[in-house]
Curated annotation (Swiss-Prot):
The active site is at residue 9. It comes from Methanobrevibacter smithii (strain ATCC 35061 / DSM 861 / OCM 144 / PS). GO terms for biological process: proteasomal protein catabolic process. It holds the Pfam family Proteasome. Belongs to the peptidase T1B family. This is Proteasome subunit beta.
Length: 204
């Protein structure tokens, strides 16, 4: 059964002084097969909330659609933006309601305040300053533990996140095929283009 499921692997999220940064590689695996080399693993929920996925691609895509709908519904009912913590709680409730083979990072900005949450397939929710998910996370955490400090900016955070994904891609056979990199600041969401990502990779 497991070799019939498309899986996404290594993702990273880091809180910074001025925002939250996210990075992932792009490989989707089916057992030992590299099924896709351009998998999307970072998703914009709205201008101040972003999620990443690791696990079953089908479950993850379904979860993203539900989160987007729930967040939009909240904002229509309350005529206000949903907080990052509330969006994480909504996601946790969705995961508790039915089995989904996916681990999600959800983070963003409430005004000037960055926050980041990890959500497991059973709906467990943990807030932290930096988090990695997926099969390459054990390698990525080595980089994060070594380089993270509380005063980092998003520019520094982007470099650390890419470095962590690069290390995971070199050691984990289920990670690789390039990078997706994004950030959220008080000015909104940005998915970095290929040129900016290549500039970061060149520095490390």
């Amino acid at each position: 059964m497991d070799d019939k499921i498309l899986e996404g692997t290594t993702t990273v999220g880091i809180t910074c002084k001025d925002g939250v940064v996210f990075a992932s590689e792009r490989r989707a695996s089916m057992g030992n097969l590299v099924a896709h080399k351009v998998a999307e693993k970072i998703f914009k929920i709205n201008d101040h909330i972003v999620t990443t996925i690791a696990g079953s691609v089908g479950d993850a895509q379904n979860l993203m659609k539900i989160i987007e709908a729930e967040v939009s519904l909240y904002q229509m009912r309350n005529n206000d933006k949903i907080s990052v913590k509330a969006a994480a709680s909504v996601t946790a409730n969705i995961l508790r309601s039915g089995p989904m083979y996916v681990q999600t990072l959800l983070g963003g900005m409430d005004g000037d305040k960055p926050s980041l949450y990890s959500l497991d397939p059973a709906g467990g929710m943990i807030e932290d300053t930096y988090i990695s998910t997926g099969s390459g996370s054990i390698v990525a955490y080595g980089v994060l533990e070594d380089r993270y400090h509380e005063e980092i900016t998003t520019d520094e955070g982007l470099e650390i996140a890419v470095r962590a994904i690069k290390a995971a891609s070199e050691r984990d056979t289920f990670s690789g095929n390039g990078y997706l990199v994004a950030k959220v600041t008080k000015d909104g969401f940005e998915m970095l283009d290929k040129e900016k990502v290549n500039d970061i990779v060149a520095k490390i």
